[in-house]
Swiss-Prot record:
Membrane topology: Multi-pass membrane protein
InterPro entries, sorted: UPF0761_bac, Virul_fac_BrkB
Matching Pfam families: Virul_fac_BrkB (PF03631)
Subcellular location(s) per record: Cell inner membrane
Recorded family membership: Belongs to the UPF0761 family.
Species for this entry: Escherichia fergusonii (strain ATCC 35469 / DSM 13698 / CCUG 18766 / IAM 14443 / JCM 21226 / LMG 7866 / NBRC 102419 / NCTC 12128 / CDC 0568-73)
Identification of the protein by name: UPF0761 membrane protein YihY
Any single GO CC term annotated in Swiss-Prot or TrEMBL for this entry: plasma membrane
C-alpha cells in the first residue's frame, strides 16, 4: 500500500517538476531580471509624467475631487510600501511644478507616459514571443484608454466603497464590508494583472492561464509589500548609508522588485499554455506509435 501511495505521489509531482523546469528555462531565456531592470529604469523616468497626467484627469472632473485625495493615499499606501510619505511629498512637488508647464511641455509629459506603456507592451510581447504587430493607431488607442479609464475606474471603485461605508442602513454589514475592503488591494491587483496579461499580448491568451498567473502575481505583490516594509523597518542600512537620499535606492529597488513580479506572472501565464501544448503533443506521439 505504501508503495502504491509513493507511486501516485511521484505521478502527481512529476508534471509539476517538469512545469517548474520549463518555467525556469523560459525565465533564463527571456532574461527576465534584465528586462525588469530596463522597465524599472523607464518607469522611474516616466513616474512623474504618469502621475501628473492621472491627477490632471481627476482635476478635469470636479466630481472626483474628493476621490482624488483618497486615490492618492490609496496608491502611496498600497503600491509604495515604507517611506511612502516621503516619496509622496516629492512626487506631489514635482506634479505641482509640472502644472506650470506650457502646452508643449504638457504634450511631452503625455508622450513620456505613453512611452512607458509602449515599453510594457514590448516587454510582454517579447515574453509571449509574439511577432504580430498592432497598427500604430490601435496601439495608441489602447494606451490612451488604459491611461485615462484606468484611474477613473479606480476612483469610481473608491467612491463606491466610501459610499457603502457611509450608509447607515449598512451598519449591520460593517463587518462584511470591512473584510471586503481589507482584501480590496489584493482583488484590485489581481484584476489589474489579469487585464494586463489578457489585453496587452497581441496573441490570444487563455483566460484560465491569465487568471492563474495574475493571482500568483497579486499574491507575490501583496507579500512583497509586507516583506519590503518589514525589511526597511528592521534593517535600515539604506538610511544609515544614504541619509536623506535613502528614498532614491529604496524607490528603485521597490520598482525593480515590482517589475520582477509582473514579468514572473507573465512567464507563469505563458508557461501554463506552453506546457499544456507540449503535453498534448507528447500524448499524440504516443498514440501514433504502433
Amino acid at each position: 500500500m505504501l508503495k502504491t501511495i509513493h507511486e501516485k505521489a511521484r505521478h502527481h509531482t512529476r508534471p509539476l517538476w517538469a512545469w517548474l523546469k520549463l518555467l525556469w528555462q523560459r525565465i533564463d531565456e527571456d532574461n527576465m531580471t534584465t528586462l525588469a531592470g530596463n522597465l524599472a529604469y523607464v518607469s522611474l523616468l516616466s513616474l512623474v509624467p504618469l502621475v501628473a497626467v492621472v491627477f490632471a484627469l481627476f482635476a478635469a472632473f470636479p466630481m472626483f475631487s474628493d476621490v482624488s485625495i483618497q486615490l492618492r493615499h490609496f496608491i502611496f499606501a498600497n503600491f509604495l510600501p515604507a517611506t511612502g510619505d516621503v516619496i509622496q511629498q516629492y512626487i506631489e512637488q514635482f506634479v505641482a511644478n509640472s502644472n506650470k508647464m506650457t502646452a508643449v511641455g504638457a504634450c511631452g509629459l503625455i508622450v513620456t507616459a505613453l512611452l512607458l506603456m509602449y515599453s510594457i507592451d514590448s516587454a510582454l510581447n517579447a515574453i509571449w514571443r509574439s511577432k504580430r504587430v498592432r497598427p500604430k493607431i490601435y496601439s495608441f488607442a489602447v494606451y490612451w484608454m488604459i491611461l485615462t479609464l484606468g484611474p477613473l475606474l479606480a476612483g469610481a471603485s473608491l467612491a463606491i466603497s466610501s459610499y457603502l461605508l457611509s450608509l447607515r442602513w449598512a451598519s449591520d454589514l460593517n463587518t462584511v464590508i470591512d473584510n471586503v475592503l481589507r482584501i480590496f488591494p489584493l482583488l484590485l491587483s489581481w484584476i489589474s494583472f489579469w487585464l494586463l496579461y489578457s489585453i496587452v499580448p497581441t496573441i490570444r491568451v487563455p483566460n484560465r492561464d491569465a487568471i492563474v498567473g495574475a493571482f500568483v502575481a497579486a499574491l507575490l505583490f501583496e507579500a512583497g509589500k509586507k516583506g519590503f516594509a518589514l525589511y526597511i523597518t528592521m534593517f535600515p542600512s539604506y538610511q544609515l548609508i544614504y541619509g536623506v537620499l535613502a528614498v532614491i535606492p529604496i524607490l528603485f529597488v521597490w520598482v525593480y522588485w515590482t517589475w520582477c513580479i509582473v514579468l514572473l506572472g507573465a512567464e507563469i501565464t505563458v508557461t501554463l499554455g506552453e506546457y499544456r501544448k507540449l503535453k498534448q503533443a507528447a500524448e499524440q506521439e504516443e498514440d501514433d506509435e504502433p
